[in-house]
């Protein structure tokens, strides 16, 4: 959009990111912790799951494919299990994407405490 307010907000965001390069390291570190935690909990529960992640952007797929590489791969995942996961996380205060065809995103304001809480709630998920 060429809206002046949107352009100003975009420029302000870029200036903040340029001045605070450590934001990327922070987001990547949190993303890695979240991915590892989700995968570890899934192994403990014997749940077939993989997490596709780039930095702080990720999607949980209920499948034994690793990684999920295509739309056809994603369609073959357990969509009912994803629905249960979504409802569980949402009911417990985490507004994650309602479809495994979307990604969740971490941001600079997320903390290790947020990740720990997410993993605590995910651990209580009953597939």
Give names to the regions the model predicted.
Residues 1-127:
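Conserved N-terminal phosphate-binding loop of PLP-dependent enzymes in the Aspartate aminotransferase
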């Amino acid at each position: 959009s060429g809206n002046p307010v949107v352009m100003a907000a975009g420029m302000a965001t870029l200036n903040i990111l340029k001045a605070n390069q450590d934001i990327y390291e922070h987001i990547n570190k949190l993303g890695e912790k979240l991915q590892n935690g989700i995968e570890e909990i899934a192994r403990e529960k014997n749940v077939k799951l993989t997490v596709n992640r780039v930095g702080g952007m990720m999607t949980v797929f209920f499948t034994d494919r690793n990684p999920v590489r295509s739309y056809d791969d994603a369609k073959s995942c357990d969509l009912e299990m994803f629905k249960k996961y979504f409802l569980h996380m949402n009911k417990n205060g985490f507004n994650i994407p309602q479809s495994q065809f979307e990604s969740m995103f971490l941001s600079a304001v997320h903390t290790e405490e947020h990740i720990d809480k997410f993993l605590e709630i995910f651990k209580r998920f009953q597939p």
